[in-house]
């Protein structure tokens, strides 16, 4: 009976999601732009690790191969949330995005503050896990705001900003350091850690927002 009720509820949730999608005659552009902006920022912030970990490791006089280990752990952590996504959402519920953004920020601060190898491993894992947690949620929301015939187009726009962030990340950080005369291997991590902390605070205050929050349909069964 319990299994039957769970199956029925999952079916009802699927019907609701489909009806939300069918109500859209065109792509909801304001929501799409906000999702693109959010995806751009978290990609830009998280990729600080892939671009600048090697410089930090070298500055800390750690083995050069350790930066490769950190980057590998970062991408491994991105994959991990997808394996237990429902459980994670069940734990954090409407605060899922807040928690994910906070993880990215905490990971960056681990790089910017600590010199210990263990904390750098924790930082790479936290940042990757938080980023990997937000990715599927952004993709799912993107599909919802477009009619079925335009869902692929909407997703292509969101995916495009992912690659745009990859391309612009080092240029944006280098431009900031030149303009502010702030230098050092820790600066990129501290800068983006502070920006991410600000976004986490905004997500907490706007946790009922479509972009920064998470609808109850994701975790109510």
Roles of regions detected by a PLM:
Residues 1-23, 211-220:
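Flexible cytoplasmic inter-helical loops of multi-pass small-molecule transporters
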Residues 31-72:
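Extracytoplasmic gate region of multi-pass secondary transporters
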Residues 69-78, 162:
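Transmembrane alpha-helical segments of major facilitator superfamily
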Residues 80-93, 177-178:
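Helix-to-loop junctions at the C-terminal end of transmembrane segments
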Residues 94-138:
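C-terminal transmembrane helical hairpin of 12-TM major facilitator-type secondary transporters
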Residues 145-181:
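A late C-terminal transmembrane helix in Major Facilitator Superfamily
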Residues 173-196:
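A membrane-interface helix-boundary motif in multi-pass transporters
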Residues 188-221:
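Multi-pass alpha-helical transporter architecture, strongest
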